[in-house]
Amino acid sequence: MSVARTVLITNRRGLHARASAKFVTLASSQRCDVQVEKDGSGSVTGTSIMGLMMLGAAMGDSITISANGDGADEAVTRLAELVEAKFGED
């Protein structure tokens, strides 16, 4: 099963190192493959801090979180909620 959801980055510092680390920790705990894409510029694995940071997602940018495999729906929901909660910042 493949699921995708687009979310808006709303925390002031965007997808920086600490936010990326929180995302990777959660993505790594999922049973499915997680990918993240910004502006159709190609996707990166959701378990790579450097990959996420290389997206350059700043406040006001949208990212698309997609997952494929067992638990994909739950994984995308949980990761989207993390982003929407500003990674616990602000």
Residue ranges and their predicted role:
Residues 2-6, 62-64:
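Intrinsic-disorder/low-complexity, polar/charged segments enriched in Ser/Thr/Lys/Arg/Asp/Glu/Gln
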